[in-house]
């Protein structure tokens, strides 16, 4: 992997021009070879050189080039390798064979011709092939005629040649005297008995394959150099010394000749010489789970993308990308062969793995009636002065109070009773209870609705709200009381009260003995905090004892309609303050007597726990989950939305009909507005409560009975008190419209545009926003800090993070294109710097890189010593490479620049690096330059796997710990990879072993 660019190209061009100027005369050099003005021999080659030429004799000739003489190869001791005759020709030679032989494929050996194979050798009856020749034979009762091919029937009588008993081995001649004389065929000699014939070397080379010598006993066969005589005394056997015996692979000399064998992964062919690769993938896919790739002499299993090969190098296992660091910003869901990133509520996915805050306010003000404030992961609607409070749906504003308070608001009940000398108090919270465990030693509980608070600058002298709700100021007085209590030898832990201790809390009795109907309070905030008593001389309790502090804040209201002629608002206020103080006094006693209860979802909870004080009390197991959580396997998990924690069963229970819970880990559910105990079980937010007006309808409070949105308006949400106008005088085709798309616009806007109701035209979405749908009146702002490359974007996928560059870590880190693994933005420039500690150098692995290859290098990644174009360049590319590469930096520090054009985009890169001790530079260089590191697909996958590359980096950064690492990672790395590293590390660290 690398660039086609040549570092220092400009320098090279300058050198070429300088040399051209210096040798301007040489630049006009004459090519004597082309013009024919050379004096080379006809059997020589002319080679032009600067300002001259040289002559070289052709192959097969010898001399100085100006005089060349043919080399007679046949004069060599081995006859040029020819086993029979060698014929010298100009510049070469050729081998020929005797009659009865033909030249072998190697051009040197001679093999017997089987004359009988073609036309029976011309024999009338039978043909017998012999080395270098053949003979015709006749059946019984016949003898061979003088032409040595036809057969003549023998007569029964007579002493002439026609008689079968004439005794001649070859030819019988009748003499003039009536006798017979025997003769031999050409190449044979008559023996002393004048009847038999003796073979000579003149016939069929004496039956010898190579050389033949005549002796008294007959021909004696011999073999050419590097051949041996067979046990038959005629045939010459090849040896492994000659052309490896003709074997493709291994050759073994045997009594019957050469014996060829093939290595593992190859099969010997029928010619007993050639080896052919076995395609293991043809049988059962080679045993591979996914992909089998045949290689020369072997095969290799590989896995589909998203899977990794196990150490048995056959089976594939899904890669759990979610186990890697930095895979997803929020939630990672592993899937077979892949993964999926999800974002928390209020965030949107971009760049495949990243989450950015959604600016809900950019989408028609988030649906708010008036103001909208974006917050991380959410947003908040606001009501301006004079428009009342925020509606329960969180978007509309209620009408200003008409001096009768807010009877529908959630109330908390604080009730106390006295039985003898014992005071028992209970805090009952029917709705809007919030439980928040702050730590192992504390929690907070809030109940009810706090009174609206004014901004500090506008607070009244008594601290009450002086906001725009003037009627609330006049009609309702908010009274606040705060108290702090201390419980010794107890620890903050909300736990269910034992049945034997339960006593019903009655109503508090006022100073005059009358029932206290004002024990309802609008809001209570309770905080429990446990800490250990510090050691000291003044400590009244033994060191290490638990001390629990309870902090209680109460809010109550006094209403104008409760005034009488004898007691106005100030009088009512004083009464309420006295009653609250009396309640707090009884509350303090009940706390000291361990008789203060928190009543949620029909269950009584104690706030602090004094272990071992009550006989028979069940000890809580140390491993139990805290309230608001349930056990899932070995972990404690918060109760999800739509459920609440039931203290008696210690389980998460779905919210009953008519209630909802949008928070996790709560002890009760909130009542739906106007609840009639109808609705789904397990409702997760107020919008799922029953009886709400559906989209396209509205009502005064958002509940039935509802009215359809008038023509010219629409409402996309449920439970709303109003409908939004189309704007610009536009109308709708029908009542009950649920979207701006139902408005009759003058033009139909396509994705990437929004309809401007002022000028009735389609406007392109500005940069940094997008619109995927038709006929909309808004563009959504890109999530988080992302933006688009151009205006008119149609998808959130076109939103990209442009942040990149910076100073990188001294030991390890990543060089990552902006928005990775999503496509990087156009027209961006990133600069990174790596400056290792002293005596450390940089190793970089490029697993893969994706840059557009058709834009003529508009997008470039370069790594060099510093920003100067003439500094030492380590790496430069403008192309896509999916094959990994590892290399060491050519300089001690690196300046890295990534620059993109305005037109193109691609996936980019995530390039890891590590710094290593320069004492191991030779070893690291040896490893990364070894082609075997990249030859196998499985080795390449190691350089792409985030976990395995980390293990590889550990070896390179600390080679002395190699053997410890291999034991740790041997279950992760292929054996071939470990073998490669082991040989190099061992030879470097233990050179003499």
Swiss-Prot record:
Iron-sulfur recorded as keyword: no
Stated consequence of mutating residue 815 to T: In SSFSC2; loss of stimulation of BMP signaling; does not affect localization to the cell surface
Cysteine pairs bridged by disulfides in the record: 33-46, 40-55, 57-68, 74-86, 82-95, 97-110, 116-127, 123-136, 161-172, 168-182, 184-197, 201-212, 208-221, 223-236, 240-251, 247-260, 262-275, 281-292, 288-301, 303-316, 322-332, 328-341, 343-355, 361-372, 368-381, 383-397, 804-830, 857-878
Glycosylation: residue positions: 417, 464, 685, 756, 785
UniProt domain CUB: residue ranges: 804-916
UniProt keyword list: Calcium, Disease variant, Disulfide bond, Dwarfism, EGF-like domain, Glycoprotein, Repeat, Secreted, Signal
SUPFAM superfamilies associated with the record: EGF/Laminin, Growth factor receptor domain, Spermadhesin, CUB domain
Domain EGF-like: 29-69, 70-111, 112-148, 157-198, 199-237, 238-276, 277-317, 318-356, 357-398
PROSITE patterns found in the cross-reference section: ASX_HYDROXYL, CUB, EGF_2, EGF_3, EGF_CA
Post-translational modification: N-glycosylated.
An annotated Gene Ontology molecular function: calcium ion binding
InterPro entries named among the record's database cross-references: cEGF, CUB_dom, EGF-like_Ca-bd_dom, EGF-like_dom, EGF-type_Asp/Asn_hydroxyl_site, EGF_Ca-bd_CS, EGF_dom, Growth_fac_rcpt_cys_sf
Principal localisation: secreted
Keyword check for Glycoprotein: yes
GO BP terms in the entry: positive regulation of BMP signaling pathway; positive regulation of osteoblast differentiation; signal transduction
Subunit composition and interactions: Forms homooligomers. Forms heterooligomers with SCUBE1 and SCUBE2. Interacts with TGFBR2 through the CUB domain; this interaction does not affect TGFB1-binding to TGFBR2. Interacts with BMP2, BMP4 and BMP7; the interaction is mediated by the CUB domain. Interacts with BMPR1A, BMPR1B and BMPR2; the interaction with BMPR1A and BMPR1B is BMP2- and BMP4-dependent.
Disease named in the record: Short stature, facial dysmorphism, and skeletal anomalies with or without cardiac anomalies 2: An autosomal recessive disorder characterized by reduced growth, skeletal abnormalities, a distinctive craniofacial appearance, and dental anomalies. Cardiac anomalies have been reported in some patients.
Known function: Is a positive regulator of the BMP signaling pathway, required for proper chondrogenesis, osteogenesis and skeletal development. It acts as a coreceptor for BMP ligands, particularly BMP2 and BMP4, facilitating their interactions with BMP type I receptors. It is required for ligand-induced recruitment of BMP receptors to lipid rafts. Binds to TGFBR2 and activates TGFB signaling. In lung cancer cells, could serve as an endogenous autocrine and paracrine ligand of TGFBR2, which could regulate TGFBR2 signaling and hence modulate epithelial-mesenchymal transition and cancer progression.
Protein name, UniProt field: Signal peptide, CUB and EGF-like domain-containing protein 3
Protein encoded by which gene: SCUBE3
